[in-house]
Regions:
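Class I S-adenosyl-L-methionine
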Residues: 1-113, 122, 144
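Beta-strand/loop-alpha-helix module characteristic of Rossmann-like adenine-cofactor folds
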Residues: 2-18, 105, 122-185
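Active-site glycine-centered loops adjacent to acidic/histidine catalytic or metal-binding residues
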Residues: 117
Length: 185
């Protein structure tokens, strides 16, 4: 957005960013869809689509969040310039793993309202009073394990791993031990 567009759009909500967990029947999604102003434009990953599909209007447009992310950002930008409002579904807290941060960095002046869903690492950090920056958080949820490999090879002292239900805890432990044999349980 150009400076003039940013000034004119100040205070307007362009994107509602909705954090979710893996619950196949989320109670908050239907309420949010019914109560926020939107233009039947929705977005998220494949997994998010499968979860929210029953709650979407029949004429909903879905923008899949996938690589290359620049294509998604271009589509968001086009819609926002047309004055459209997008409802975007993401895992957990949109600022914790970054889609909201990506939007902030790349689409200057875009107004967002964020509804986070705190993930298990965040809840653990709160319970144990660990500052987020002291834990190297890695997500292997629907992603390859490259970031976990890197964290292990860098001997990060505290690694928090967000995962799907599969692979199992035993599999994740074996992975950690295979890279860092001195690791104990």
């Amino acid at each position: 957005m150009r400076t003039q567009e940013i000034v004119e759009a100040y205070g307007k909500t362009h994107i509602y960013m909705i954090g979710m967990d893996d619950n196949p029947q989320p109670k908050h999604i239907e309420v949010i869809i019914k109560n926020v102003k939107h233009d039947n434009i929705f977005s998220g990953g494949k997994r998010h689509y499968e979860i929210v599909k029953p709650f979407l209007p029949a004429d909903a447009v879905w923008i899949e969040i996938k690589a290359p992310i620049n294509a998604v950002l271009t589509e968001y930008s086009r819609l926002i310039q047309e004055g459209k409002v997008i409802v975007s579904f993401v895992s957990g807290d949109p600022f914790f793993f970054g889609f909201a941060s990506t939007i902030r960095k790349n689409l200057l002046g875009v107004g967002m309202k964020v509804f986070p869903y705190f993930n298990s690492l965040q809840m653990f950090a709160h319970h144990e009073q660990i500052p987020y920056e002291n834990m190297h958080a890695v997500s292997v949820t629907g992603r390859p394990w490259h970031e976990l490999d890197r964290a292990l090879l860098e001997y990060r002292p505290l690694i928090g791993v967000l995962t799907d239900r599969a692979p199992s805890a035993r599999c994740r432990r074996s992975k950690c031990l295979s890279i860092s044999p001195s690791t104990t349980t």
